[in-house]
């Protein structure tokens, strides 16, 4: 008896329709694409109760002819193609004839339409779940078509319940999809409205029939986003992308849109390449981009998935390589932006004058060091500020020389005022003893070098002249490749690089000579009298390596007494130790019935209450026993996690009113999420006023921001919370800055590594872990506990 039977047509229809219409976004997508295919220039999308009650798309397209009323909802009836070969020259979004038929299968569909010749009289078509025409009514209607889908997924109970449960998330996905179509559709006006039970019809987003994609981006995402974009037009590529600078990109990749011939598609490989190219320019940030690829229809296959967003490219590798090279060239042409610090001088100096004993005293240089015109220009795009550890670079003398090169071709700062009187007197007082000490130090160096040379049978004695004629003029550092940089090893000051002409110095053999040179005030040129001997003469005198006969080596011997009984004892002891180590590192047979017990160990929070503290190891870890297992618990990480969750649960956020309220420039989806979660946002300390009469994106005004001691939060923290709520509306999010602040505070107040604990204190730390929601890691990611071994294996 045959068990293979055909599926009835009704079941086939429901199964296939469930693949095409999977959520609110896919339903809206099919309706909007039908409107675009009809040649509409104005498209209006209306949601009632987040799409749960109804979704309606109204356009001013060509309308539906009277001869198509009966077949408009039938499966695989379409006006787009007649045979498979037409796909190679396809110019429309749809081609399967499944959209309206699938919508009929999962909801109640009502179509109102009128052609150019019929308007202002139109027809209302009521379709059943099979797509058949139930009845037809004459109504007043302008040219175009309206498709309304009521009670979406009424025939699929599981999907209906999921929609009612996750309606905000599904609505956000639909709005994001409409943002993409509104962005790519030039010369077309998009309007999206939403109406709930407690509010009137609210505009979510709109465009103004713009001729350029960037204007659409400005309408949809706001001026802040559009102003951070640059055009990307190269061959098959047209569109806009974020500037490769920090501040122009975003923390998430939710605003990345790829189109092929203006069809929204998923191309993960291309998106990944764009992300990789941007990574060196903006770490941990994602660029915004809206890119359309103009590709010949014959080289792409769009008949891959029910939603037509997955495509195959015959020349994918070549296209990816072209996009990569094009984007790299675009990023390199943009240069790299460095924020200017207009309130700081281009250079900051702090002088450090070492005295004869190596101690140092900070001296102030003149505060006014005017630079050349190129350095003081307001149009400068480079701001240079020395860190505290690098400021003490200038050693003062009676006539100090300051020479700092910022970049190739940069002008040098000129000293315009004399040194302070106190600094001049101090410098004059030091100048004479300094020369005397240099001379004495040089004499001592001669003697030590002579002793060193004679003791090692070498003739490489060098002498350092006792006089060091110094030149003080302000010169630009020499480009001579023989210049040598010697680091100052003096512990009394920050290491300073000294410029010494290699052609004028004889040699330096140990740290004392380097220290002697470093104690001299910094100059651009330092000359030493004696010259380096020729290479040939130096090699002839070199006697460092001498061959020695093998029998000249020292010989050592020692008598060892060995007894047979001692060897036997050692063997027994080694065997016992080997058996013990094998038990600890036992390898279990994979066929063992209890193999999972050896590989997995489950610990529940309640187990912390039953753990017995054995003691403390290395003043950093608590050793505990639970059942047959031995654990170590990190005392600092565990206490830190307890303090962190305690601070988080008892956090009181204070708000600081803004002197001037700030109008928020938000995307439509961000604004919707903020309005839907306004009570939660206000509990986070953000005071927000809402004016529904304003245009979309500017309805919210920031009145106050949360503060905590010296930390003041801003709009970036608010946007981060909104982003989390859009993805996970059921959680209570904290901004990452607040998380870091609480983690830092918890860390500082926790038990530190190195502190000896009593048994009572160790028990308290272990018991606290049972009270936490997630006790397994500290806020910084370090695990709180580790399993050591099973006691039965010892």
UniProtKB/Swiss-Prot annotation:
It holds the Pfam family MutL_C. One of its GO terms (cellular component) is nucleus. Residues 352-371, 430-442 have a biased composition (Polar residues). It comes from the Eukaryota. Residues 419-429 have a biased composition (Basic and acidic residues). Residues 351-384, 409-442 are annotated as: Disordered. Gene3D superfamilies: 3.30.230.10, Histidine kinase-like ATPase, C-terminal domain, MutL, C-terminal domain, dimerisation subdomain, MutL, C-terminal domain, regulatory subdomain. GO terms for biological process: maintenance of DNA repeat elements; meiotic mismatch repair; mismatch repair. One of its GO terms (molecular function) is ATP-dependent DNA damage sensor activity. SUPFAM superfamilies: ATPase domain of HSP90 chaperone/DNA topoisomerase II/histidine kinase, DNA mismatch repair protein MutL, Ribosomal protein S5 domain 2-like. Disulfide bonds: none annotated. This protein is involved in the repair of mismatches in DNA. Belongs to the DNA mismatch repair MutL/HexB family. This is DNA mismatch repair protein pms1. The gene is pms1.
């Amino acid at each position: 008896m045959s068990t293979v039977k055909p599926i009835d047509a009704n079941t086939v229809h429901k199964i296939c329709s469930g693949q095409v219409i999977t959520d609110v976004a896919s339903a809206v997508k099919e309706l909007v694409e039908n409107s675009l295919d009809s040649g509409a220039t104005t498209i209006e999308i209306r949601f009632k109760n987040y799409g749960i009650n109804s979704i309606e798309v109204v356009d001013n397209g060509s309308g539906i002819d009277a001869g198509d009323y009966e077949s408009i909802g039938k499966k695989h009836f379409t006006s787009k193609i007649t045979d498979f070969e037409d796909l190679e020259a396809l110019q429309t979004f749809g081609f399967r004839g499944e959209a309206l038929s699938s919508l009929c299968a999962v909801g109640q569909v009502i179509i109102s339409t009128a052609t150019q010749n019929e308007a202002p009289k139109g027809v209302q078509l009521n379709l059943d779940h099979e797509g058949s025409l139930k009845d037809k009514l004459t109504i007043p209607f302008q040219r175009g078509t309206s498709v309304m889908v009521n009670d979406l997924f009424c025939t699929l109970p599981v999907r209906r319940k999921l929609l009612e449960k996750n309606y905000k998330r599904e609505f956000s996905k639909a709005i994001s999809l409409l943002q993409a179509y509104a962005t790519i559709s030039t010369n077309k006006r998009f309007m999206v409205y939403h109406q709930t039970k407690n509010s009137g019809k609210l505009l979510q987003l709109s465009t103004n029939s713009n001729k350029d994609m960037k204007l659409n981006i400005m309408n949809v995402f706001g001026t802040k986003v559009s102003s951070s974009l640059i055009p990307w037009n190269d061959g098959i590529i047209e569109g806009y992308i974020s500037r490769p600078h920090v501040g122009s990109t975003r923390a998430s990749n939710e605003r990345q849109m790829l189109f092929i011939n203006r069809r929204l598609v998923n191309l993960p490989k291309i998106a990944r390449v764009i992300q990789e190219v941007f990574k060196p320019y903006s770490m941990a940030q994602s660029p915004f981009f809206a890119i359309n690829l103009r590709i010949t229809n014959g080289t792409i296959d769009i008949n891959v998935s029910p939603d037509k967003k997955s495509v195959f490219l015959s020349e994918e590798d070549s296209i990816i390589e072209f996009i990569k090279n094009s984007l790299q060239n675009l990023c390199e042409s943009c240069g790299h932006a460095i924020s200017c610090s207009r309130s700081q001088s281009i250079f900051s100096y702090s002088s450090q004058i070492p005295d004869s004993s190596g101690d140092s005293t900070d001296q102030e240089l003149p505060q006014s060091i005017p630079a050349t015109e190129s350095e003081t220009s307001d149009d400068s795009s480079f701001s240079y500020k020395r860190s505290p550890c690098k400021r003490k670079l200038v050693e003062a003398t009676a006539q100090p020389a300051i020479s700092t090169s910022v970049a190739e071709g940069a002008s040098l700062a000129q000293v315009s005022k004399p040194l302070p009187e106190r600094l001049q007197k101090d410098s004059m007082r030091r100048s004479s003893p300094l020369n005397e000490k240099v001379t004495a130090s040089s004499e001592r160096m001669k003697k030590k070098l002579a002793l060193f040379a004679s003791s090692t049978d070498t003739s490489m004695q060098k002498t350092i002249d006792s006089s060091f004629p110094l030149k003080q003029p302000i010169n630009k550092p020499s480009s001579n490749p023989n210049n040598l940089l010697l680091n100052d090893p003096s512990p009394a000051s920050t290491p300073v690089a000294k410029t010494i002409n290699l052609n004028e110095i004889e040699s330096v053999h140990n740290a004392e000579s380097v220290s002697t040179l470093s104690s001299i005030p910094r100059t651009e040129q330092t000359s030493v009298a004696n010259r380096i001997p020729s290479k040939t003469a130096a090699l002839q005198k070199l006697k460092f390596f001498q061959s020695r006969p093998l029998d000249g080596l020292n010989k050592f011997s020692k008598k060892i007494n060995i007894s047979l009984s001692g060897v036997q004892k050692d063997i027994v002891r080694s065997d016992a130790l080997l058996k013990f180590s094998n038990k600890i590192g036992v390898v279990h047979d994979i066929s063992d019935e209890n193999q999972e017990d050896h590989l997995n160990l489950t610990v529940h929070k309640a187990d912390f209450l039953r753990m017995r503290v054995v003691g403390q190891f290395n003043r950093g870890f608590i050793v505990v026993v639970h059942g047959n297992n031995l654990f170590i618990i990190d005392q600092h990480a565990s206490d830190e996690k307890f303090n962190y969750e305690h601070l988080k649960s008892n956090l009181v956020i204070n708000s600081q009113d803004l002197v001037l309220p700030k109008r928020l420039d938000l995307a439509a989806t961000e604004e919707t999420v903020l309005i839907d979660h306004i009570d939660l946002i206000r509990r986070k300390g953000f005071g927000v006023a809402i004016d529904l009469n304003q245009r979309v994106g500017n309805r919210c005004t920031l009145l106050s921001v949360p503060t905590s001691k010296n930390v003041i939060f801003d709009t970036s923290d608010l946007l981060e919370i909104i982003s989390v709520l859009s993805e996970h509306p059921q959680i209570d999010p904290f901004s990452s800055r607040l998380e870091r602040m609480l983690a830092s505070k918890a860390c500082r107040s926790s038990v530190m590594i190195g502190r000896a604990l009593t048994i009572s204190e160790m028990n308290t730390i272990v018991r606290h872990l049972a009270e936490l929601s997630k006790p397994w890691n500290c806020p910084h990611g370090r695990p709180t506990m580790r399993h050591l071994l099973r006691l039965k294996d010892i």
